[in-house]
UniProtKB/Swiss-Prot annotation:
Its EC number is 1.1.1.94. One of its GO terms (biological process) is glycerol-3-phosphate biosynthetic process. This is Glycerol-3-phosphate dehydrogenase [NAD(P)+]. Sn-glycerol 3-phosphate binds at K106, G136, K191, D244, S254, R255, N256. It comes from Corynebacterium jeikeium (strain K411).
Length: 332
């Protein structure tokens, strides 16, 4: 049994906390809002994010970071990518000297260009081999319901990856290890952007052929970028690559896809956010960071560029989609 702290009580953070508890560990879930922590602690629910799904008794909630992190051997970071730095600065002195840090966030920090594992290592002042990422085709509600799923625990230290793998292996949740942190993080970031594009296409009324094209060409540009920055090509065809991409681009549970659908129907960013519980999808923020990284290393990412045009430059979705199809012809 391992002592686990999960910092962030959104839908995915709460779900991961549930998985660790179902795997036989004691878990403390830190929530920013008192009513969420109380719901988890007193009712074994997170009604705000997971409805009536019952949470295990081994999982408790708190709003006190010190209480959550006290004695934690595994610290799971479940806050959004663009607020991770600020939160981690507040928590870093409370994290044990030998604790493993696991990032759930998928993104590239816009101000620095850092991947999330790099940001965690820098801000918490820990060596990179103590930082892992958990990523894969893991839609929170399905996992929280106990539906079978697999994931990837990526860490440059394979022994540490195996320790985390053992701790998070629940009867319905199968973790695989990988040492390609770069590939897993680039894939996890880009898939949100591609899912926006898939949603835009669906919102415009296009069908399965278009969806398959967006997904496949999205994987192609993700792979080009990932390889250019040092990833292993095999990662892109695995759970953290193709698996996560397919789930996020096709599922009605995917916030990025749903957000894209609203954009495809002609809504503004503000209207789309209002239609999706007031949240701007992660892919909107990530699209700029991904495009800037791609330009920096000289990689062509036309789908990402199109998403940037729609989300940040006021481009018309019809013109953008037709522009993608009208690009100069080339070999696949």
């Amino acid at each position: 049994m391992v002592q686990v702290a999960v910092m962030g009580a959104g839908s995915w953070g709460t779900t991961v906390a549930k998985v660790f508890a179902d795997a036989g560990n004691e878990v403390r879930l830190w929530a920013r809002r008192a009513e969420v922590a109380e719901d988890v602690r007193d009712n074994h629910r997170n009604s705000a994010y997971l409805g009536d799904i019952e949470l295990p008794a081994a999982l408790t909630g708190t709003t006190d970071p010190a209480e959550a992190l006290n004695g934690a051997e595994i610290v799971v970071l479940g806050v959004p990518s663009q607020s991770l730095r600020e939160n981690l600065q507040n928590w870093k002195d409370l994290i044990g000297p030998d604790a493993s840090l696991v990032s759930l966030a998928k993104g590239i920090e816009h101000s620095s260009g850092l991947r999330m594992s790099q940001l965690v290592s820098e801000v918490a002042d820990v060596p990179s081999e103590r930082v892992a990422v958990l990523t894969g085709p893991n839609l929170a509600r399905e996992v929280a319901q106990g539906q079978p799923a697999a994931t990837v625990v990526a860490c440059t230290d394979m022994d540490r990856a195996k320790l985390i793998q053992a701790a998070v292996a629940a009867p319905y949740f199968r973790p695989y290890t990988n040492t390609d942190v770069i590939g897993c993080e680039i894939a996890g970031t880009c898939k949100n952007v591609i899912a926006l594009a898939a949603g835009i296409a669906a919102g415009m009324g296009f069908g399965d052929n278009t969806a398959a094209t967006v997904i496949t060409r999205g994987l192609a540009e993700t792979t080009r970028l990932a390889l250019e920055v040092g990833a292993d090509a095999r990662t892109l065809s695995g759970l953290a690559g193709m698996g996560d991409l397919v789930a996020t681009c096709t599922s009605t549970l995917s916030r990025n896809r749903r957000f894209g659908e609203h954009l495809g129907k002609g809504e503004t960013l503000e209207q789309a956010a209002a239609s999706t519980k007031g949240q701007v999808a992660e892919g909107v923020v990530s699209s700029q960071s991904v495009f800037e990284l791609a330009e920096k290393v000289g990689v062509e990412t036309p789908i990402t560029e199109a998403v940037v045009g729609v989300c940040h430059e006021g481009a018309d979705v019809q013109q953008i989609m037709m522009g993608l199809l009208g690009r100069s012809k080339k070999a696949e």
